[in-house]
Amino acid sequence: PGWISGAPVLLLVGGGHNGADTLLAGGLLSHSGCAVTAVLATEHPHPVALEEARSHGVTVYGAGYRSDGAEDWDSAEAVAAVEAFLARGGLVLDGLTGIGATGPLRPDAVALIAPLVAAGAPGRRPLRVIAVDLPSGTGVDDGTVDGPVLAADCTVTFTCLKGCLCLPPARHLCGAVEV
């Protein structure tokens, strides 16, 4: 549709199923005309989802992927892609972690979200964040927050509500919750 043609979208991608879902959603958005960039915080993204996203024109940066085609980690290039996105604003899909993750985000993921977190709280920043299943870095079952988390404007979760979507302090980082 014409209303999304060229709209900037940033995918924050981890190695689990949420990362795969994020890549697949990004491929659909790119196919629909959005300008989609994926930044990987893993050296092991879901291979089928990654290929699907790339086949639909998603630009990929991060672990194992660089814009020049080299197959090595370039965190500086991935962070630069996040900063370039931030200069335009748009939609972020947070698929860094899911229900299998525990503890705070790993350093590579923290580096990717740092410029976005610094941009401000939901409603006060030039972007909107949709968390895939849960805001990455929140305690899935108990709602703990042990490190930086990119606060979502909306969290789209699957099957049922998780503890982090209902319990403080994580609940305050979820935005509107859709099951």
Predicted regions and their residues:
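Nucleotide and nucleotide-moiety/phosphate-recognizing core
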Residues: 1-98, 104-132
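YjeF_N-associated NAD(P)HX repair module
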Residues: 89-179
